[in-house]
Regions:
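Short secondary-structure boundary/hinge segments and terminal tails
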Residues: 37-39, 86, 126
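Redox-cofactor binding/interface segments in oxidoreductases and associated redox assembly factors
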Residues: 44, 77, 174
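Amide-donor transfer/coupling interface in amidating biosynthetic enzymes
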Residues: 108-198
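Short coil/turn connectors at secondary-structure junctions
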Residues: 1, 39, 71-73, 96-97, ...
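Hydrophobic anchor at the start of a short beta-strand
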Residues: 27-28, 75, 171
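Cysteine-nucleophile active-site neighborhood
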Residues: 49-123
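N-terminal beta1-alpha1 cap of cysteine-dependent amidohydrolase-like domains
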Residues: 1-58, 62-70, 184-198
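Cofactor-binding loop segments of dinucleotide-utilizing enzymes, especially the Rossmann-like FAD-
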Residues: 9, 80, 176
Length: 198
């Protein structure tokens, strides 16, 4: 069984624990850089991306995590976690840092405010079966991607709709929250990615 860490500084930590355990992984809460040594992959949950960036720096974990990610540790970012994996952040703060794990330009809060949150059924490239129930909460979207990035889903299932799920090598990101609900297919996909690397 693989150990998958969840960055436990803010966000839907308990929901990710449940989703990973239902997907056959052992979930490990990560709050300090030394805890990274005990995990085979890491989930960066939603929350508020500028706060998350500041907490990572305050807790002294940013540089260690950046090194692990650049060395190929599988990583999955949801919502604010997607922002943290981007090479470029639009509408972010000047001092906001990201890991640059996925060659993409992400716009913060692109879908609007909390009141604009919604759910839709998405067709996901690489995930079989019925459409995936995607919950968007003050979500970002991807404005553009580099050639190495595989687009997995677009809002509205439209050919030219905003990009909301991507994969690049060992990095996976969604602008929505798959940990909400009981459909574990994204966490199962990530667990398989981690199993292949460990």
């Amino acid at each position: 069984m693989v150990n998958i860490g969840i960055l436990a500084l803010q966000g839907d930590v308990a929901e990710h624990v449940r989703a990973l355990e239902e997907s056959g992984a052992r979930a490990v809460l990560v709050r300090r850089s030394e805890e990274l040594a005990s995990v085979d992959g890491l989930v960066i949950p939603g929350g508020e991306s500028t706060t998350m960036s500041n907490l990572l720096l305050s807790f002294g974990i940013f540089d260690s995590l950046a090194e692990q990610i650049s060395n190929g540790m599988p990583v999955y970012g949801t919502c604010a976690g997607m922002i943290m994996l981007a090479t470029t952040i639009l509408d972010g703060r000047d001092d906001q840092r990201s890991f640059g794990a996925i060659d993409m330009v992400v716009r913060r809060n692109a879908f609007g405010r909390q009141v604009d949150s919604y759910e839709e059924e998405l067709d996901i490239k690489g995930i079989e079966g019925k459409p995936f129930p995607a919950v968007f909460i003050r979500a970002p979207w991807v404005e553009s991607v580099g050639e190495s990035v595989d687009v997995l889903a677009r809002a509205g299932n439209a050919h030219d709709g905003p990009i909301v799920a991507v994969r690049s090598g060992q990095a996976l990101a969604t602008s929505f929250h798959p940990e909400i609900g009981t459909d574990w297919r994204f966490h199962e996909l990530f667990t398989r990615m981690v199993q292949r690397e460990s």
